[in-house]
Curated annotation (Swiss-Prot):
Protein name per its UniProtKB record: Mitochondrial fission 1 protein
Modified residues (Phosphoserine): 10
Record remark on domains: The C-terminus is required for mitochondrial or peroxisomal localization, while the N-terminus is necessary for mitochondrial or peroxisomal fission, localization and regulation of the interaction with DNM1L.
Cytoplasmic compartment residues: 1-122
Ranges annotated as spanning the membrane: 123-143
Keywords: Acetylation, Apoptosis, Membrane, Mitochondrion, Mitochondrion outer membrane, Peroxisome, Phosphoprotein, TPR repeat, Transmembrane, Transmembrane helix, Ubl conjugation
Consequence of changing residue 110 to P: Approximately 40% of cells display fragmented mitochondria. No change in binding to DNM1L
Subunit structure: Interacts with DNM1L/DLP1 through the TPR region; may form part of a larger protein complex at the endoplasmic reticulum-mitochondrial interface during mitochondrial fission. Interacts with MARCHF5. Interacts with MIEF1. Interacts with PEX11A, PEX11B and PEX11G.
Record topological domains on the Mitochondrial intermembrane side: 144-152
Amino acid sequence: MEAVLNELVSVEDLLKFEKKFQSEKAAGSVSKSTQFEYAWCLVRSKYNDDIRKGIVLLEELLPKGSKEEQRDYVFYLAVGNYRLKEYEKALKYVRGLLQTEPQNNQAKELERLIDKAMKKDGLVGMAIVGGMALGVAGLAGLIGLAVSKSKS
């Protein structure tokens, strides 16, 4: 599962599917499969703007798809949001998938990895806030020391 989350699309694939998508769009109608393939590539990009664009395309597809297609759309919506560190949204999608398919092992593993990332980022966030608080307290102490010495 971690391989799926960390996999990057090749530039060649991204360009190939973008060209196909743009060609169909210019002709007036993009097929669901073409839109999904392009979105799937975008979600695996190393650029956050591409990932966001892929998420938008997947969200557009969601109401149009069959049950099987929706499962894929929701899964990659969770993956895209995970890659953007939008863990709450990623969890929303993966838990929705687990409601309809409680035995889906891929979704269970993705949920576990999202929870793990949230805990890790939460701890890192707390450490940063704690470090900033110590820095402010230290600075206040130095200012207090300087003021008391200047009065002496």
